[in-house]
From Swiss-Prot:
It comes from Escherichia coli O81 (strain ED1a). GO terms for cellular component: plasma membrane. This is Cytoskeleton protein RodZ. GO terms for biological process: regulation of cell shape. Cytoskeletal protein that is involved in cell-shape control through regulation of the length of the long axis.
């Protein structure tokens, strides 16, 4: 009867209480049990108070309770029903794979990096395109402005061409005028001999004159033909005497055009030797004081010779830009 009462009383006690009572009967402290089982004192205390640490797996907790039961001489079979309540088996929480999470974060970071790279690339391409378009537009505007200026200057030159031709004609007339007095003098000298009226016949002049007196009168009378002989024999000035072959200027600038091209040439004194549009298959010969400053709208459409040597314009043709260069006395074109 006492045995059954004791058995019922043991069943009423929890697993932790039975282990604590057994420990106290053996005179062991919690520190001694913890040292023998190689556990923490807090773990032994939690077992006796029927607490299940959240950070401790149920499998380990059941193992600690069994070791504690063997230490205090309690059969494990008597504690099994209480173990199911105190330390039920729980599914272990499997932590997510660290490598997978790291790979996912790395992939996300790589995606952002790739997006940023493409964005920078698009910005660079856009800026390059905008810069090229602005440069091209500026060149076109400059060519248009130069063409307008050349047209205006060409119109001014055409309006001034008539007075220049008149002055040239006047100079030529003045050059030929000195020959007129000579011819007029000769004509006037000869005119009295031809148009002089015949004198009236005087009865006294019909008388016979002695031969000696006739000779004296003949010698004293000047011969009209003798006065005209020097004028007729004198050579008249001709235009061929005034024509001279001009010497070749060592600073001459020769240009041949294979297409329509706008051009402006200025010499060292600042004088514009030419400014305007040249047509295809045209040529231009200019002379002035070196160095020359040239501004060419289409470098590929012109071939330049200076001092008998061709001028290299390949660097302007490759870049398709308006050529600005200076030709000095040593024929070293510089931009």
């Amino acid at each position: 009867m006492n045995t059954e009462a004791t058995h019922d009383q043991n069943e009423a006690l929890t697993t932790g209480a039975r282990l604590r009572n057994a420990r106290e009967q053996l005179g062991l402290s919690q520190q001694a049990v913890a040292e023998r089982l190689c556990l923490k004192v807090s773990t032994v205390r939690d077992i006796e108070e029927d607490k299940a640490p959240a950070d401790l797996a149920s499998t380990f907790l059941r193992g600690y309770i069994r070791s504690y039961a063997r230490l205090v001489h309690i059969p494990e079979e008597e504690l099994l029903p209480g173990l199911e309540k105190q330390a039920p088996l729980r599914a272990a929480k499997v932590a997510p794979m660290q490598s997978f999470s790291l790979g996912k974060r790395r992939k996300k970071r790589d995606g952002w990096l790739m997006t940023f790279t493409w964005l920078v690339l698009f910005v660079v391409i856009g800026l390059s395109g905008a810069w090229w378009w602005q440069d091209h537009k500026a060149q076109q505007e400059e060519i248009t402005t130069m063409a307008d200026q050349s047209s205006a200057e060409l119109n001014n030159n055409q309006s001034q061409s008539v007075p220049l031709d008149t002055s040239t004609t006047t100079d030529q007339a003045m050059a030929t005028t000195p020959t007129s007095p000579v011819d007029t003098t000769a004509t006037n000298t000869q005119t009295p001999a031809v148009t002089a009226p015949a004198p009236a016949v005087d009865p006294q002049q019909n008388a016979v004159v002695p031969p000696s007196q006739a000779n004296v009168d003949t010698a004293a009378t000047p011969a009209p033909a003798a006065t005209t002989t020097p004028d007729s024999a004198a050579p008249l000035p001709t235009d061929q005497a005034g024509v001279t072959t001009p010497a070749v200027d060592p600073n001459a600038l020769v240009m041949n055009f294979t297409a329509d091209c706008w051009l402006e040439v200025t010499d060292a004194t600042g004088k514009k030797l030419f400014s305007g549009m040249q047509r295809k298959d045209g040529n231009l010969n200019l002379t002035g004081q070196a160095p020359y400053k040239l501004k060419i709208g289409a470098p590929a459409a012109v071939q330049i010779q200076y001092q008998g040597k061709p001028v290299d314009l390949s660097r302007f043709i490759r870049t398709n830009q308006v050529a600005r260069l200076t030709l000095n006395a040593e024929q070293s074109p510089a931009q």
